[in-house]
Curated annotation (Swiss-Prot):
It is found in: Cytoplasm; Nucleus. Its EC number is 3.6.4.13. It comes from Gibberella zeae (strain ATCC MYA-4620 / CBS 123657 / FGSC 9075 / NRRL 31084 / PH-1). The Q motif is unique to and characteristic of the DEAD box family of RNA helicases and controls ATP binding and hydrolysis. Its main location: cytoplasm. One of its GO terms (molecular function) is ATP hydrolysis activity. This is Pre-mRNA-splicing ATP-dependent RNA helicase PRP28. It catalyses: ATP + H2O = ADP + phosphate + H(+). Residues 26-63, 88-104, 688-698 have a biased composition (Basic and acidic residues). GO terms for biological process: mRNA processing; RNA splicing. Residues 64-77 have a biased composition (Polar residues). Belongs to the DEAD box helicase family. DDX23/PRP28 subfamily. A motif (DEAD box) lies at residues 445-448.
Length: 721
């Protein structure tokens, strides 16, 4: 019966449909199929492993059969007897090859030790050959038979970029290449008792005496003389070694060396010890003591009479530079002894000038010292008279607050040194009461404060009024001490200008660039930082009443004795705080800008004499005012900027003595909190309170407002105080 196409198509379609439908397989069926599949895979693995094992055995048998045919022919034994050659014409190729192998075997047999090792040795040789061939094919030829790997030696990775500074003794190639290392011997001769590095240790002399004693005992005739020679050689060698060590700067501290033995390394250590940093060309080394200062003996006697034992860091660095007639910029923390640092070289300078007489006394002073405040001027005048008086020099101060006629009267006999504030000095020059025709020595003390108080224009006019005939050239000659110390066609000398400041704002730098010639710059410590002798304490106390109560607790604690200075920000608070302090049982005076000059002098004199216990002041007293032995400074109001704060707390801890500064902070002081935290963190004896450390305003430097920047640029600081 023929196949029906339609039937076939129908069956195919039904089969495809059934195949497309998901088919449910019972669990037992699935487990059976999985077991059959696993068994099939296992059988395949066993079959493949068996085939590989059989193949390996066949190859091994083949190698063994090939290897066993050689030793029987090459072990030196006799050949199997054969018939005549004519009966052996039917030898196959294998027998011919065997004869050829026999000839090679005889040659190889000559190198073998004997017949007893024949079969075993040849079988091992075949295996070795096979292993060698396999190794050579897959691993390459053997080049280095001995490994130099050391587990102790650090291995560097190819990706490791860090340089290895370690050194291993095995890396020393000099012993292989330099024959000198092969002939090392222990050198022992008379006088060689030094230790490692040629230095004589504590036991060197004892070893020398033992050796001398041993030689004296062994040689009864000449031993004693030889022993004495050994000891003489030892002492001579030790002295030379010590001198050599001293010259290298390794033997003594700089304080124990003479000036001639000081090396560059010693001067570097000396400067680090005192926090001295210098900048400029041809700067001399600092002085270590007053005796090495090159000051005249009569000045040294005055220094001794005044009671200056050891020079301060600014005096050590600035005096040698100033004695070479160099222009100088001194950047030093407040209370560092700057006054004597510029007064002593000034007196040496004018000592070489002709004395004032009836003719030249009307040409003005030889030296001019400018300071920002009246109190600082009078303080410098008092200090200058201590040194200038015994030398016969006159010192006159010119400040506001006094009658100008009185100051003109003081100048009638002339003066070698004039100390003045810029405002009153310019007034005297414009009124023709004073000329500067022969002024050749100019000092600006607290130059940054003068600019803050608005004296920039006055300072420029005063400096422009100086004679130009003795002005220094702005060349390398300004750094040459010999040229600068020459006289200019008679009695004139090059003008010397010095500037002392605690900070270097741009306006001060502009004045220095205009009027100073190639100045040497001396920095003591870090500019703008407080001295390390002041312990700074900060307390968060807001509100006037709470601050007065806290001030009373501090004063009544008994930890601080008079004199004490309390700083406030505005003038009207001075009298109020002073009145409260008086109610606490303390005597108090005030000092601010509304006081007359007589009142200012009376207030300072009362505190210095010990008649008054507490001085309440504005920032007027924050700069340069020297009240001896101030034990405590209280910032009743935090200063408006960190520079004023630095100079406020600098009223204590002066002249090497210690002091305490306590500051009351409030929410209104957020602009200074960051700088205050920085200056506290740099102090070795002060701690940053946790509240200030975590305060939001202390985390980043504040952005100054436009109005404040304008005021600072105009030079109008706190002049109203």
């Amino acid at each position: 019966m023929p196949l029906d196409i339609e039937e076939l198509l129908r069956k195919k379609k039904a089969a495809d449909t059934a195949a497309a439908k998901p088919r449910f397989i019972p669990k037992a069926e699935r487990e059976r199929l999985a077991a059959e599949k696993a068994k099939k895979e296992e059988d395949d693995k066993k079959r493949k492993a068996s085939e590989e094992e059989q193949k390996r055995k066949e190859e091994e048998q083949k190698w063994r059969s090939n290897g066993s045919s050689r030793p029987n022919e090459s072990n030196g034994s006799g050949r199997v007897p054969t018939g005549p050659r004519s009966m052996n014409d039917g030898r196959d190729d294998r027998e011919r090859d065997r004869d050829r192998d026999q000839g090679r075997g005889r040659v190889r047999g000559k190198d073998r030790k004997g017949d007893k090792q024949g079969v075993g040795a040849d079988k091992q040789s075949a295996e070795d050959i096979e292993a060698t061939l396999l190794r050579s094919r897959y691993l390459g030829p053997q080049v280095n038979q001995q490994s130099n790997f050391s587990a102790k030696k650090k291995r560097m990775r190819t990706t490791e970029k860090k340089f290895n500074f370690e050194w291993d003794a095995d890396e020393d190639t000099s012993r292989d290449n330099d024959p000198l290392y092969d002939r090392q011997t222990a050198v022992s001769h008379n006088g060689s008792f030094a230790g490692i590095g040629g230095e004589f240790d504590d036991g060197a002399e004892e070893r020398a005496r033992k050796r001398a004693k041993m030689i004296a005992q062994r040689d009864p005739e000449n031993g004693k003389e030889r022993a004495e020679g050994i000891m003489e050689d030892f002492f001579r060698a030790r002295d030379k070694a010590r001198q050599r060590a001293d010259r290298r700067g390794l033997g003594k501290h700089w304080s124990e060396k003479s000036l001639d033995d000081m090396r560059e390394r010693d001067w570097r250590i000396f400067k680090e010890d005192f926090g001295i940093a210098t900048k400029g060309g041809m700067i001399p080394n600092p002085m270590r003591s007053w005796q090495e200062s090159n000051l005249p003996q009569r000045l040294l006697n005055i220094v001794d009479d005044v009671g200056y034992k050891d020079p301060s860091p600014i005096q050590r660095a600035a005096i040698p530079i100033a004695l070479q007639a160099r222009d100088l910029i001194g950047v030093a923390v407040t209370g560092s002894g700057k006054t004597a640092a510029f007064l002593l070289p000034l007196l040496v300078y004018i000592s070489d000038l002709p004395p004032l007489d009836e003719i030249n006394k009307h040409d003005g002073p030889y030296a001019l010292i400018m300071a920002p405040t009246r109190e600082l001027v009078q303080q410098i005048e008092t200090e200058a008279r201590k040194f200038a008086g015994p030398l016969g020099f006159r010192v006159v101060s010119i400040v506001g607050g006094h009658q100008i006629e009185e100051q003109a009267y003081n100048l009638r006999d002339g003066a070698e040194i004039v100390v003045a504030t810029p405002g009153r000095l310019l007034d005297c020059i414009e009124r023709r009461l004073l000329v500067l025709s022969q002024c050749c020595y100019v000092i600006m003390d607290e130059a940054d404060r003068m600019i803050d108080l608005g004296f920039e224009e006055s300072v420029n006019k005063i400096l422009d009024a100086l004679p130009v005939t003795n002005e220094k050239p702005d060349t390398d000659e300004a750094e040459n001490a010999q040229i600068m110390q020459r006289y200019l066609g008679g009695r004139d000398r090059y003008r010397q200008t010095m500037m002392y400041t605690a900070t270097m704002p741009p306006l001060v730098e502009r004045i220095a660039k205009k009027y100073l010639r190639r100045p040497a710059i001396v920095t003591i410590g870090n500019a703008g930082e407080a001295v390390d002798t002041v312990e700074q304490r900060v307390e968060f106390v807001s509100g006037e009443d709470r601050r007065k109560k806290r001030l009373q607790e501090i004063l009544s604690s008994g930890n601080f004795g008079p004199p004490i200075i309390v700083f406030v920000n505005i003038k009207r608070n001075c009298d109020a705080v002073a009145r409260d302090i008086k109610q606490m049982g303390w005597s108090a005076v005030t000092l601010h800008g509304s006081k007359t000059q007589e009142q200012r002098e009376a207030a300072l004199g009362s505190v210095r004499a010990g008649h008054t216990q507490v001085l309440v002041a504005t920032d007027l007293a924050g700069r340069g005012i020297d009240v001896p032995d101030v034990s405590l400074v209280v910032n009743f109001n935090m200063a408006t900027n960190i520079e004023s704060y630095t100079h406020r707390i600098g009223r204590t801890g002066r002249a090497g003595k210690s002091g305490v500064a306590i500051t009351f902070l409030g929410p209104e002081d957020h602009e200074t909190m960051y700088d205050l935290k920085q200056i506290l963190s740099k102090s070795s004896i002060s701690k940053v309170p946790e509240e200030l450390r975590r305060h939001e305003a202390a985390q980043s430097k504040p952005v100054r407002g436009a109005k404040k920047d304008k005021d600072e640029g105009s030079g109008k600081g706190n002049w109203q105080h």
